[in-house]
């Protein structure tokens, strides 16, 4: 993904092959991976977890992100499950000099 004239992040998704047979990669150029999987394969993510870790990019990642070796990055790994079955691993390398993470947390009020 890019913003203006520079790349921001590298996104890679690993899908459970037996769950997503005959995947059509060209369709992904036009929209969201998750929207495509939901409509084409009736995917329903029931839970997901995410891990954020600081990192330095490897040679290939530095070339794609157009950054020197000393620029820190953030590795975001998301693990998506469908009824306790791991179906998607999403790996994102985000350049640390042009991107901020923002999180918001909400309390779910339980009704009695």
Task: Cite the ranges covered by each PLM segment.
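C-terminal all-alpha effector/ligand-binding and dimerization domain
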Residues: 1-112
